[in-house]
Regions:
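The structured alpha-helical core of multi-pass membrane proteins
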Residues: 2-660
């Protein structure tokens, strides 16, 4: 786009506003602002919808969590004491991590109703908190970006491990299916990614009822076993968890790396808060999901007490023989739904990264005219598909993948705790004496899980770490490259007021029509305007300087979208503001300008864009290899005309070479 300081081109989104307002106090109470407590008639449908989007990931954990505790790479013998100890860890993990940490505390840290690690990061990096806070901001920014990078790894691993673990039930039904598990899983995953371009609006309506049926089914399976051995419920006492570590020592600590699989998906509860609100998500958790999960886990424990030989797959061995194939079908459907949630989450995360300036522009396709949140990013879809296929072919089974899965999850959980603590202190004003012990407890749990998975780096944990480092490097390189480019452009810029004053009262010759000059810095004269004056020596009758800024909030109210200012010589300065969950659109901006009294005739309007040709150099600022990477990312970014929906036949591009 424009070659001005902070401009969104080439290949960048609009510049993020550094001083957006903090989320409203009302939003800290657990619902999106303005919604208030939902009546039951509205709460139930929202909770059902949340079942189909939010709880797919955590809902499929019973397929493999206890299996890995007792038969994984670091599995422990399924003795009665060990079974009770593991069940106690499972119970308290679900209570402390999901029920208390995420649902009671983290979900209060919403950014005007939106959740997720980038929304949380946007709250953290907003100006405020004094010099000490500003000094910590780079570290917090790095933490948040690495957490987001790990989520991309989870978006690759979740579809692979969920679908593989579901299809592996066929091997329990009959060993004849064992050689076909990987091919069947690949076919299902390929179909899942191929339908993404068509959107999931139609089939999405059945996700909620399907997941409700799934949770009821696994609850019934658990009850069948508990009726025969209710003594397993003693594991609710934390004494069994303490005894488990006391008796097993280091081995018991390693098993904690498998126990954490029961809380995978916790981040999804927070990330999807903007779709449903906090209260429906909590209602679904305490009303159905938590009871169903606990009944199933304790049912698996009862089965293991009765028959330790089924440790290789206790979930499927709970089912009677006649129900195995239907259960495999239902579990596969749940795995697909869990995968869809992570894929959609990757799309949303990428759009946020683009708008906040951490990623170059990409094609964003809206798959629903009614739901603005239903988007499809072809580039991300292809990358995820390639990653998932390679992971399935490389690891071959869900048991081999869970080590990789755990590291991605625990890293993000720990980072979320740190960022939420900063928000509590600096945004809410919570005293350190209160915030620190609470955050310290959560962080101690998170780091315990993380420590138990770090030792598995050689067994698959290297995968999310590698993906995280690669994506972190890409995002920070893009951000730093844009900052360096902005600095160079600012040094060569000219204030628009100074330029106009230099013409005196008459100014250059005017020609009919309207010219819109895109700029990222509303105070500076766009380079495209300077080139036009230098070579053509004319101004259009109506000349507009348009800048598009992204605020650190998810949505900008319509009344605050566009501001119009008058400049000397009849020029106008238009500033359009968007949230990081919104897509900038030139047609939308022109419509709002007309409403503000600034008419446009698109057929007589020309859009002047600057296009920079970037040249890597050995000058100070960024390593040469990162400059080369930044130039490559810039060249492969989506064209500004397509990203901002500018009529391509009305665009004039003026280029310039810039040495980094």
């Amino acid at each position: 786009m424009s070659s001005d300081p902070g401009s969104p081109g080439p290949g960048s989104p609009p510049s993020a506003s550094p001083a957006a307002p903090a989320s409203s106090p009302a939003s800290h109470l657990g619902h999106a602002p303005g919604t208030g407590p939902e009546p039951l008639a509205r709460l139930a449908p929202l909770a059902l919808g949340a079942l189909g989007i939010v709880y797919g990931d955590i809902g499929t954990s019973p397929l493999y969590a206890l299996r890995d505790c007792f038969s994984g790479a670091h599995g422990i013998a399924p003795t009665p004491a060990n079974v009770l100890g593991v069940l106690s860890l499972v119970f308290w993990s679900l209570i402390i991590v999901i029920s208390v940490k995420y649902l009671a505390f983290v979900m209060r840290a919403d950014n005007r109703g939106e959740g997720g690690i980038l929304s949380l990061l946007a709250l953290v990096v907003q100006r405020g908190g004094g010099e000490r806070s500003a000094a910590r901001r780079p570290l917090l920014l790095a933490l948040g970006l690495f957490g987001a990078s790990l989520l991309y790894g989870e978006s690759i691993i979740t579809p692979a491990v969920s679908v593989l673990s579901a299809v592996e039930g066929l091997g329990v039904a009959t060993p004849l299916f064992a050689p076909y598990v990987v091919p069947i899983a690949l076919v299902i995953l390929l179909a899942l990614f191929l339908v993404q371009r068509h959107g999931t609006g139609g089939i999405g309506r059945v996700f909620g009822p399907l997941m409700a049926a799934y949770f009821l089914t696994i609850a019934v399976l658990g009850v069948r076993e508990l009726v025969g051995n209710p003594s397993v419920l003693r594991a609710v006492s934390p004494v069994h968890a303490v005894s488990f570590f006391a008796q097993n020592g280091w081995h018991g600590f390693l098993v904690l790396g498998a126990v954490l699989l029961v809380v995978t998906g916790g981040e999804a509860l927070y990330a999807d808060m903007g779709h449903f609100g906090a209260r429906p998500i909590r209602f679904a958790w305490f009303g159905l999901v938590l009871p169903a999960l606990l009944l199933n886990y304790f049912g698996q424990g009862a089965l293991l007490l009765r028959n330790p030989g089924v440790a290789s797959n206790p979930f499927y061995y709970m089912a009677p023989q006649w129900a195995l194939y239907p259960l495999v079908g239902l579990a596969t459907a749940a795995a697909v739904i869990a995968s869809q949630a992570l894929i959609s989450g990757a799309y949303s995360l990428t759009r946020q990264a683009i708008q906040l300036g951490y990623s170059p522009r990409m094609e964003v396709v809206h798959t629903s005219a009614e739901e603005r949140g239903q988007i499809y990013l072809p580039g991300v879809n292809v990358a995820l598909l390639v990653g998932v296929v390679l992971v399935v072919l490389g690891f071959r089974s869900s048991a081999n993948l869970t080590a990789a899965y755990g590291l991605a999850v625990t890293g993000t959980m720990a980072i979320t705790t740190c960022l939420a603590y900063v928000v509590a202190r600096e945004r809410w004003g919570v005293r350190r004496a209160i915030a620190l012990p609470v955050a310290g407890l959560f962080l101690a749990v998170d780091l315990s899980y993380f420590g138990a998975t770090v030792v598995k780096v050689a067994h698959g944990g290297w995968l999310p770490l590698t993906l995280g480092v690669v994506l972190f490097t890409l995002m920070t390189t893009w951000k730093r490259g844009r900052e360096l480019l902005g600095q160079k452009l600012r040094a060569a810029s000219l204030r628009i007021e100074d330029l106009l004053e230099s013409f005196g009262d008459n100014g250059p010759q005017r020609v009919p029509g309207t010219a819109i000059f895109m700029t990222g810095n509303p105070e500076a004269a766009p380079t495209a305007l300077l080139h036009n004056l230098k070579h053509n020596k004319v101004l259009h009758e109506q000349t507009v300087l348009l800048s598009i800024a992204t605020e650190d909030v998810p949505h900008v109210p319509a009344a605050e979208r566009v501001t119009v200012e008058s400049l000397p010589l009849g020029l106008r300065r238009v500033t359009a503001r968007y949230g990081f969950m919104e897509d900038p659109s030139i047609p939308d901006i022109l419509k709002r300008c007309r409403e503000a009294g600034l008419p446009f005739n698109v057929m007589s309007t020309s859009f002047f864009l600057g296009r920079e040709t970037l040249i890597p150099s050995k000058k100070p600022g960024m390593a040469l290899w990162r400059e080369v990477l930044f130039v490559w990312m810039s060249r492969n970014s989506r064209a500004a005309t397509a990203f901002f929906r500018i009529p391509p036949n009305r665009v004039v591009e003026l280029g310039a070479q810039i040495e980094l």
